Amino acid sequence: MEHNNVNLVECTLRIDPAVLRELPERCKITSINAHGVSFWAKTGRIDVLLSDGTPQSFFVKVLSEEIGMSMTKGEFHSMSAIHEVTPEFVPKPIACGTYDTIPDTHFFLCEFREMTEKMPDPDQFASGLSKVHQKSVSPTGKFGFHITTYAGNLPQYVAWEDSWETFFAKSMKQALDLEIQVKGNSDELEVLSEALFEKVIPRLLKPLESHGRTVKPSLIHGDLWHANAGIDADSNQPLIFDACCFFAHNEYEFGQWRPACNRFGDEYITAYNKLVQISAPEEDFEGRLDLYRLRFDTHVSALFVGDETLRTQ
């Protein structure tokens, strides 16, 4: 399913000057090849020799049109935010920008890290992820992000909000509106939506911020399914990539792990909860994760217009 009309052959026959300016000075390009798979972009690997003869590799993602510019900016700022907190946990982001020679074509550039296809060790992965969540500090003290980020090719709600319940409700509403735009509304959906916003969300999220409790706005990856994580082939340490960040309740991250098709099983949540205390009230933990899953599932249903099973599952 392709949503980007960038011609990879045209883009990789030579390096656009805008990309070249972001590579190390006086480096020599030795190869450019397609690398990786994306529904929304063209991706490639650039191999160079530095001026001292040292080999180095870079990953480039290329998108087109105005939405492509917004997506590359969102990813660059997301990866930069994670890298600032835990530089060992993500490939180093280098730049985002617009091609000089191909109209309306935009890129995201980062260091290339060779990765294995194995799932990361739960304890090692939980250690890295917990550092992102715990060490990060919202610049406003609120939930949200300073720039729109995209899960797939659809925007996420990122406006700054004081309350996590308020932020999540607005985020859920935006995802639902996007889904209804492409798959239509129904009387049943109207009834379910009313119950969701008037009863379910307040029931599960209001207690987090009641009776003296507070929720720390934590930097989250935003789309942390197993295809956006790997193991560095050289260091054997876990890595995450393809982020679409915002500051959220840390447990929101795990809503993406609930579907059976996801390879982040219960052992990863168990490992994480050894390091980070479950938010009170703990008895609502499973219910909160199911609610967060609904937000992810709704967004995914909006992304894949022709798949009606995503709405009914």
Where does each model-flagged region fall?
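Short, surface-exposed acidic
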Residues: 24-31, 186-193, 277-286
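ATP-binding pocket architecture of kinase catalytic cores
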Residues: 34-166, 170
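Active-site Asp-x-Gly
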Residues: 160-169, 173, 177-178, 214-219, ...
